[in-house]
């Protein structure tokens, strides 16, 4: 296929050449369910959702794995402080992540394995590494990976081992596991159970009771579901080191080819800083959707290139919502005029979509170029509506909706059917032709207003609202978009 993606390991665009022709295997590092999700957490899921939709639209079968880390030091510490069993704590926040994914229209993965559900696979991998001379036990129940034994260590992040002080994330370092290392740069594969920890938070192993290190689960579970070699490993850019570097080291040391391409998304930032609970600058989905539809949040996350940071500020959601309203208005009016396209009609192949859109998506998911192509078809659709050309209206509806569906943003899809904007009449028009005519006329003005808001032409947007008010039409901007009523 013609899709090229930026490979973090080689630092260049690489063609996607599936290991198994016609099939793409993807592993995405999912959530560590220690707390409620915020918009920064969800960017990876949304970015990879667009990739998966494009792969499927391109006729490829996709096996998509997104793991859940449901046990680690932070989960144990926070659950203990709250007086809640660690597993109940993890389940609570796993549910919150799932609800947030669904709220943003993210497709479910093929499998969503939990770390605690794959302890035997992780123990087997540790034993394999020990047998191959890449891991050792300290005799106190801890097992470490010998970084110096893996000659390509550092190749993912372009670092030299001799320049490294540690290969552990600061949050994973503790004195109990540091003491037994032969080399301070080695990292834990198995952590011995500590006094005072819940007995349910450890498992029997050849080295004593304990639990896996953070990096091990992804190597074990990607092998379990995707095999020795798969196509794409993804995650946030902050996971490149040490997590992904250590994953690669484990898997290569086990004798597996592992990931062919490494695809990393950038952060969501506020005032130039990564969105992080420790900085107190996070925004939950619940907070954001109090004033705006979830579709606007999805728009904000989907329409910036995945390798570019999203600077989240006061205008982010208003701008995204204005753009969403513009497209939603056209789709609603086109459906009113000629009816809704069938699901089958909307599944246009890349060859059937505008060439500019297909070329942009194949170019490392260039959403800016893809959206330019959608805007061009939107203009033609509005012309068709103005001219009353039913055939052209239907064709443009199919094109616009089919392209937006690749981004998970088809306004008439079941996901967003109740989150439309721009032409939602608050009164049923029924079969009354006068009410229907009024709905269409008001809808046309609200579409112009949505365009003005998208262009930040606030004066024109206010003038349209005021003109409608003078005619007895009240406009309300709510979280589900602009609605109107008489009175």
Model-predicted segments: where are they?
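Alpha-helical recognition segments enriched in aromatics with Gly/Pro capping
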Residues: 1-34, 49, 120-336
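N-terminal, positively charged nucleic-acid-binding surface of large information/translation enzymes
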Residues: 10-15, 19-107, 125, 484
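Alpha-helix C-terminal capping/helix-coil junction sites
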Residues: 56, 102, 130-131, 263, ...
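Short phosphate-binding/catalytic loops that engage adenosine nucleotides
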Residues: 60, 134, 473
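Short, glycine/charge-rich beta-strand/loop segments that flank catalytic centers
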Residues: 68-73, 95-97, 107-122, 140-149
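Short Gly/Ser/Thr- and Asp/Glu-enriched loop/turn motifs at secondary-structure junctions
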Residues: 108, 138-140, 477-481
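Structural preference for alpha-helix termini/caps and helix-kink/transition segments
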Residues: 274-275, 281-487
């Amino acid at each position: 296929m013609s899709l090229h993606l930026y490979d973090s390991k080689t630092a260049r665009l690489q063609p996607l050449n599936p290991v198994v022709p016609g099939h793409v295997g993807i592993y995405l590092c999912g959530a560590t369910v220690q707390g409620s999700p915020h918009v920064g957490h969800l960017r990876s899921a949304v970015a990879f959702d667009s990739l998966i939709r494009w792969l499927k639209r391109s006729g490829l079968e996709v096996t998509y794995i997104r793991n859940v880390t449901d046990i680690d030091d932070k989960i144990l510490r926070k659950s203990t402080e709250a007086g809640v069993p660690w597993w109940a704590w993890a389940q609570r926040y796993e549910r919150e992540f799932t609800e947030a994914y669904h709220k943003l229209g993210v497709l479910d993965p093929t499998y969503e394995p939990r770390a605690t559900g794959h302890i035997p696979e992780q123990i087997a991998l540790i034993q394999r590494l020990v047998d191959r001379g890449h891991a050792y036990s300290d005799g106190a129940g801890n097992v470490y990976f010998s970084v110096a034994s893996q000659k390509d260590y550092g190749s993912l992040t372009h670092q030299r081992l001799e320049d490294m002080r540690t290969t552990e994330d600061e949050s994973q370092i503790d004195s109990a596991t540091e003491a037994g290392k032969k080399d301070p740069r080695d990292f834990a594969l198995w952590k011995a159970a500590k006094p005072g920890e819940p007995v349910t938070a450890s498992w029997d192993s050849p080295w004593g009771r304990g639990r896996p290190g953070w990096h091990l689960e992804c190597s074990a579970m990607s092998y379990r579901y995707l095999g020795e070699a798969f196509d794409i490993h993804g995650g946030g850019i902050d996971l490149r080191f040490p997590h992904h570097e250590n994953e690669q080291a484990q898997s290569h040391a086990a004798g597996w080819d592992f990931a062919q391409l490494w695809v990393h998304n950038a952060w969501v930032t506020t005032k130039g800083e990564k969105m992080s609970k420790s900085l107190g600058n996070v925004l939950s989905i619940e907070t954001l959707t109090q004033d705006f539809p979830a579709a606007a949040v999805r728009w904000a996350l989907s329409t910036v290139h995945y390798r570019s940071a999203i600077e989240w500020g006061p205008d982010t959601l208003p701008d995204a919502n204005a753009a969403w309203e513009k497209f939603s208005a056209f789709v609603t009016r086109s459906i009113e005029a000629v009816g809704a396209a069938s699901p089958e009609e909307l599944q246009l192949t890349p060859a059937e979509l505008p060439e500019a859109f297909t070329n942009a998506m194949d170019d490392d998911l260039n959403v800016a170029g893809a959206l330019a192509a959608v805007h061009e078809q939107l203009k033609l659709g509005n012309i068709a509506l103005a001219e009353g050309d039913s055939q052209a209206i239907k064709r443009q509806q199919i094109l616009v909706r089919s392209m937006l569906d690749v981004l998970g943003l088809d306004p008439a899809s079941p996901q967003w059917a109740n989150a439309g904007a721009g032409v939602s009449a608050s009164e049923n028009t029924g079969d009354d032709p006068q009410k229907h005519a009024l709905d269409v006329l008001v809808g046309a003005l609200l579409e112009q207003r949505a365009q003005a808001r998208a262009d930040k032409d606030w004066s024109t947007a206010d003038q349209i609202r005021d003109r409608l008010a003078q005619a007895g039409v009240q406009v309300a901007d709510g979280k589900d978009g602009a609605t109107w009523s008489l009175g």
